[in-house]
A protein has these predicted regions:
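Active-site loop-to-helix junction immediately N-terminal to the catalytic Tyr of the SDR YXXXK motif
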Residues: 150-159, 168-171
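Alpha-helical segment proximal to the catalytic Tyr-Lys
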Residues: 124, 174-178
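Conserved mid-core segment of classical short-chain dehydrogenase/reductases
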Residues: 76, 87-105, 124, 128-136, ...
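Canonical Rossmann dinucleotide-binding motif of NAD(H)/NADP(H)-dependent dehydrogenases/reductases
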Residues: 2-33, 172
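Catalytic Tyr-X3-Lys loop
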Residues: 78, 86, 97-117, 140-141, ...
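Residue(s) in the substrate-gating loop at a strand-loop-helix junction
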Residues: 145
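The beta1-alpha1 cofactor-binding region of Rossmann-like NAD(H)/NADP(H)-dependent oxidoreductases
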Residues: 39-40, 56-66, 101
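Active-site helix of classical SDR
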Residues: 119, 161
Length: 188
């Protein structure tokens, strides 16, 4: 895919890997929607890159819909890069007792459920795209981690969330390939 002129959403784009991804896409000529919960940083980056900002908690359906609508208003949505995520270090049983279930669920909800939320909403928009001359309608990229295969002590929640990303990518890719939308995961 020629990135120049294409519209991409990058989640978690106000900092870290997401910010680096947004900067790389913009440097290649993409129009980038910075989708993040960090409004001040996200708005500043969007201004700097000539893109747009969408206040987006990836776990919230309405926020995801708004980010996709923002992207579609800029042109044909051709890419989603899921970088939003959190990591906590907490042993299954530590000196203060059992791993907090709420913390485990929070990591799964943001890293895995949030990624799926954005994939399904972006894919819906991409399915409506007229194919590019190459036949493509878009690309869906989710950030996994080596922790999906080799998580360390204290990384149960993070490793499970990234294992989920790896596990859901192939079935999504198989289905999306029928309409020429690519789905991939990779180590961040």
């Amino acid at each position: 895919m020629d990135i120049a002129g294409q519209v991409f959403i990058v989640t978690g784009a106000a900092s870290g890997l997401g910010e680096g991804t947004a900067r790389m896409l913009a440097s290649e000529g993409a129009r980038v929607v910075i989708a993040d919960v960090q409004a001040d940083k996200g708005q500043a980056l969007a201004r700097e890159l000539g893109g747009a900002f969408a206040q987006c908690d990836v776990t919230q359906e309405a926020d995801g819909q708004a980010a996709v609508a923002q992207a579609v208003s800029m042109g044909k949505l051709m890419g989603l890069v899921n970088c939003a995520g959190i990591a906590i270090g907490m042993k299954t049983v530590g000196k203060d007792g059992a791993h907090a279930l709420a913390q485990f669920a929070k990591v799964i909800n943001i890293n895995l459920v949030g990624s799926f939320n954005m994939i399904r909403l972006a894919a819906e928009a991409m399915c409506k795209n007229e194919p590019e001359p190459t036949g493509e309608r878009g690309v869906l990229i989710s950030t996994a981690s080596v922790a999906a295969y080799d998580g360390q002590i204290g990384q149960a929640a993070y490793a499970a969330s990234k294992g989920g990303i790896v596990g859901m990518t192939l079935p999504i890719a198989r289905k999306r390939s029928m309409d020429r939308t690519l789905a991939r995961s990779g180590d961040g």
